[in-house]
Amino acid sequence: MAAIPSSGSLVATHDYYRRRLGSTSSNSSCGSVDYSGEVIPHHPGLPKSDPGHWWASFFFGKSTHPSMTTVSESPESSGTFSISNGLIPCRLAQESLQKQKVGDPKSDSSPSA
């Protein structure tokens, strides 16, 4: 079971203000920050989560990585895909192009002599 650190390294996403705790530093994998006890306002133009770590999107739901795109196959016709955010993973695009070349004689990739 993981222990919760008492140095305040957990992030509260629902608070508008973050309260810094009375410790002098944090010795965690989340980075080292000095805490002095004052209330720090959250700027309205900035996201409330900490986007500085690759794993932040797993907790805060803001994924922009192309391989994290949700792709689902249409049940009506095999080979038709629905993509949720407009990005196509490279492997899926390559497989789709290869299938089109096999089925379409006009897009034959062999060089003409």
Curated annotation (Swiss-Prot):
GO terms for biological process: cell differentiation. InterPro entries: PPDPF (IPR026754). Pfam families: PPDFL. Keywords: Developmental protein, Differentiation. Belongs to the PPDPF family. Probable regulator of exocrine pancreas development. This is Pancreatic progenitor cell differentiation and proliferation factor. The lineage of its organism: Eukaryota, Metazoa, Chordata, Craniata, Vertebrata.
